[in-house]
Amino acid sequence: MADPDHVASIDAIVRAAYDVISGSSGEKRDWDRERSLFYPGARLIPTAKPGATDGLAPQMLDVEGFIARVEPYFAENGFFEKEIARRTEQFGCIAHVWSTYESRHNADDPEPFMRGINSIQLFYDGNRWWIVTIYWQQESAEHPIAKKYL
């Protein structure tokens, strides 16, 4: 069950989504909290290269698949992700958030090791917000983040 404060608004659920995955190396993440943010059947979709010689492609994950993918990394590496800019559009009970992020290994690192954009689709059921999809791509030399997203 989600904490009502974490799902009461678009701001709250986006903040919770970043907070739950952030922590020091070896710090256990609250995966029940993570699960509580997502609508049943929700997807997390990193854009990545499946193999060294492959091009970018969406990697379709459910919440459990995402946890299985990142948990070993978090056990060995600090990971702190924070939102640095946002564009939100809403119609009725659906919302779309372009959320630009920076990632650091330590919360106080002066520079991020990675930046990118999360495309977050949300649903409001009349009582709370749910994450339906987070689809993201890291910034690269080939795909720098446009000023309108900063």
Task: Map each language-model feature to its residues.
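Short, low-complexity N-terminal intrinsically disordered segments enriched in polar/charged residues
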Residues: M1-L37, L150
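Hydrophobic pocket/interface hotspot
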Residues: A17, E34, A42, V97, ...
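Short beta-strand segments enriched in hydrophobic/aromatic residues
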Residues: I21, F38, Y101-S103, Y135-Q137
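Non-catalytic cap/lid and distal C-terminal segments of serine-dependent acyl enzymes
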Residues: Y39, G65-R69, F79, M114-I117, ...
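Surface-exposed, charged secondary-structure patches
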Residues: R43-L44, A48-D109
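Tryptophan-centered short beta-strand motifs
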Residues: P58, P110-P112, W129-I131
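Short beta-strand edge/turn micro-motifs at domain boundaries
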Residues: R115-I145
